[in-house]
Amino acid sequence: MSEIIWDLALIQKYNHSGPRYTSYPTALEFNENYTNEDFIRAAARYPERPLSLYVHIPFCHKLCYFCGCNKVITRHRHKVEIYLDYLEREIKTRAPLFQNRLVTQIHWGRGTPTYLDEDQSARLMQMLRANFDVSDDAEISIEMDP
């Protein structure tokens, strides 16, 4: 068996913490200087391109120490309904800005989207389909933690 040769210069080059890209634009881009008008202008760009939707589900039963996502650790399942109510308001407010764009991808991210029960998952999917033009063959994915 051949011996592993470590490139010390390469190790030292990358031996530091880097940024975590858990969203785009990154969370730091959203601040008091980013206005609703900025959002509307950004939404109007590239009207011919298909749209990808990301839905953040922040709920988890327990804390995973590796996770850097925005999360709510709770066993109070009623909080999901409150969150979905607010999410529905946001979707209804923002969806008209994208009315002529076909949704080809939907991704549910963490916390743990599997925290939602079957009815809540169906409710969320119905919200998206009712407010966006979702392609029949859209790629739909969900993050999960067994």
Swiss-Prot record:
- Which cofactors does this gene product need? [4Fe-4S] cluster
* Positions of [4Fe-4S] cluster binding: C60, C64, C67
Keyword Cytoplasm in the entry? The reply is yes
Protein's UniProt keywords contain Iron-sulfur: yes
- GO cellular component terms? cytoplasm
Gene Ontology BP terms? porphyrin-containing compound biosynthetic process; protoporphyrinogen IX biosynthetic process
Q: Where in the cell is it found?
A: Cytoplasm
User: What's its top-level EC category?
Assistant: oxidoreductase
Amino-acid positions noted as binding S-adenosyl-L-methionine 2 in the UniProt annotation, renumbered to this chain? F66, G111, T112
Cite the EC number. Answer: 1.3.98.3
Organism superkingdom: Bacteria
InterPro entries from the entry? Coproporphyrinogen-III_oxidase
Q: Name one GO molecular function term.
A: metal ion binding
Q: Which cysteines are joined by disulfide bonds?
A: none
Q: Which family does it belong to?
A: Belongs to the anaerobic coproporphyrinogen-III oxidase family.
What is the recorded function of this protein according to its Swiss-Prot or TrEMBL entry? Involved in the heme biosynthesis. Catalyzes the anaerobic oxidative decarboxylation of propionate groups of rings A and B of coproporphyrinogen III to yield the vinyl groups in protoporphyrinogen IX.
Q: How does it assemble?
A: Monomer.
Recorded protein name is Oxygen-independent coproporphyrinogen III oxidase
Organism from which the protein derives: Mannheimia haemolytica
